[in-house]
Amino acid sequence: MGRTHELSQQAVDVKEVTAQDTAKLTVQGQTVELPIVAGTEKEQAVDIASLRGRTGWITLDPGFANTGACTSGITFLNGEQGILRYRGIPIEQLAESGTYLETAYLLIYGSLPKRAALERFNRAVLENTSLPQGMERFFDCLPKTAHPMAALSAMVQILSAYYPNLTDPNPSPERMEEVILALLAKIPTLAAH
């Protein structure tokens, strides 16, 4: 089953930011106060979500090098320092001591699984690995020179034709879990083709 149980989830101490913490931006004599927010690892950010609505101004950040697209308790990334963490756990630790399904469980449910939970999760995924009958013929429609990611993407899209009940744009939590398990199970099978 899992190689881990050496993995440990680290609590990340996040600096408290109060409502009084703001940044002032002045352009052409007009000043706006924008809230300061703290990220998952104490990095500070200016929340500019209201800037355009309040002033008509936008920001420019080529390549989004200084832009966080959302707040996330799932992933922390700092490319300059070579840091990637999932739920506070360094990716190197997950790669060395964890499995694909343990990491998936961590990302989905927010914590590393206990042995019994991992066994149930592994079983649920393994029960869904086979592809629908006839789907293999779609591989023959792809050029032999197709990029692997293009082929995988196309095949994932084709899966939705076989599972129309899983394409609800507003799924219940149970249905969402069903979709996640199906994709976790079938993507390695698709990639193996």
Predicted segments with their positions:
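Hydrophobic alpha-helical bundle cores within soluble ligand-binding/oligomerization subdomains
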Residues: H5-H193
